[in-house]
């Protein structure tokens, strides 16, 4: 089923809505999960999906979220990005992990529970945005619909961790990483200006030089303080028994080794280090439209 979902190209682009692309995907979902579509109340809002599974009570509803769109498939692939190939014990393709796998998982879970005649104790909502990859208005529209219905979720499960190998350098094995908190996000645009000019007579300290110096300085001197939140400390405590002796000693005694971990962890694992502080990543840049013009 996951392979079939991957074969439906649901690439999304900022501020561009292709209804036919997502209508094809919705038709595929209906074929794959007929009971979900027969028994649950379905609402479609500009390609965004909301299913309501009525439970015995309505005071503590849960929301299961997973977006249906994927980012453009660029670069080279060992398997075609929308092939849905099953090889080497894996399903390959764009969206296999981000995040049609979780979308498939909760649809399949509900499908099997419906087949078994199960009735949930409380209402369950299945929510899927088609604009997540570019921070579009899909999720806000679904939230607005829940508010309109007077739904106040007791629990929301969104895209988070997965079953990963070696979550931190030196700890082998497969671990199910359940996310219990989420970072915020801000996009900041930095602009350097000048009077412009021609590359044959460049001025000193050009906009590109200034921005390059700024980027280099920020990456060398991280302005954000590192700290261990309680949830992060608890994760290390849970992982400690599976670590080699030296690492187990450190992770099991964070009250003593926190200063050392703050220094070393980002060098050992970028992903683990990101749990300790606000991160900065420079991702897009634009200058002159011609190679011989100074912006």
What do these predicted ranges mean?
Residues 3, 30, 104-107, 111, ...:
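Predominant activation on well-ordered alpha-helical scaffold segments within soluble catalytic domains
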Residues 1, 290-295:
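Short, intrinsically disordered, charge-balanced linker/junction segments flanking boundaries
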Residues 1-99, 113-122:
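Acidic/His- and Gly-rich active-site-bordering loop/insert found
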Residues 91, 97-177:
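Acidic/histidine-rich catalytic neighborhood of metal-dependent amide-processing enzymes
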Residues 146-149, 154, 162-174, 178-187, ...:
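Acidic-enriched catalytic cores of C-N bond-cleaving enzymes acting on peptides and small amides
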Residues 7, 11, 34, 115-118, ...:
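Generic secondary-structure signature for well-ordered alpha-helical cores
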Residues 97, 194-200, 289:
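A generic structural motif
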């Amino acid at each position: 089923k996951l392979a079939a979902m991957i074969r439906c190209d649901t690439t999304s682009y900022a501020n561009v809505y292709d209804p036919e692309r997502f209508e094809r995907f919705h038709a595929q979902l209906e074929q794959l999960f007929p009971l979900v579509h027969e028994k649950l109340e379905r609402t479609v809002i500009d390609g965004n999906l909301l299913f309501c599974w009525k439970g015995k009570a309505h005071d503590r509803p849960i929301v299961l979220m997973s977006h249906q769109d994927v980012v453009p498939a660029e670069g080279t692939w060992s398997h075609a990005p929308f092939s849905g190939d099953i090889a080497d014990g894996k399903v390959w393709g764009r969206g296999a992990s981000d995040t049609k796998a979780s979308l498939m998982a909760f649809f399949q879970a509900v499908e099997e529970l419906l087949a078994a005649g199960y009735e949930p104790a409380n209402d369950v909502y299945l929510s899927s945005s088609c604009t997540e990859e570019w921070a579009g208005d899909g999720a806000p529209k679904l939230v607005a619909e829940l508010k309109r219905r007077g739904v106040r979720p007791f629990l929301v499960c969104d895209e988070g961790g997965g079953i990963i190998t070696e979550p931190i350098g030196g700890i082998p094995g497969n671990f199910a990483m359940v996310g219990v908190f989420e970072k915020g996000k801000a996009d900041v645009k930095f602009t350097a200006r000048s009077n412009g000019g021609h590359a044959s007579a460049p001025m000193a300290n050009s906009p590109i030089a200034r921005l390059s110096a700024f980027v280099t300085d920020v990456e060398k001197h991280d302005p954000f303080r590192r700290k261990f939140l309680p949830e992060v400390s608890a994760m290390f405590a849970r992982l400690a028994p599976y670590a080699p002796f030296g690492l187990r000693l450190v992770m099991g005694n964070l009250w003593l080794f926190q200063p050392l971990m703050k220094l070393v962890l980002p060098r050992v694992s970028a992903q683990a280090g990101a749990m300790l502080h606000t991160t900065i990543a420079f991702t897009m840049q634009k200058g002159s439209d011609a190679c011989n013009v100074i912006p």
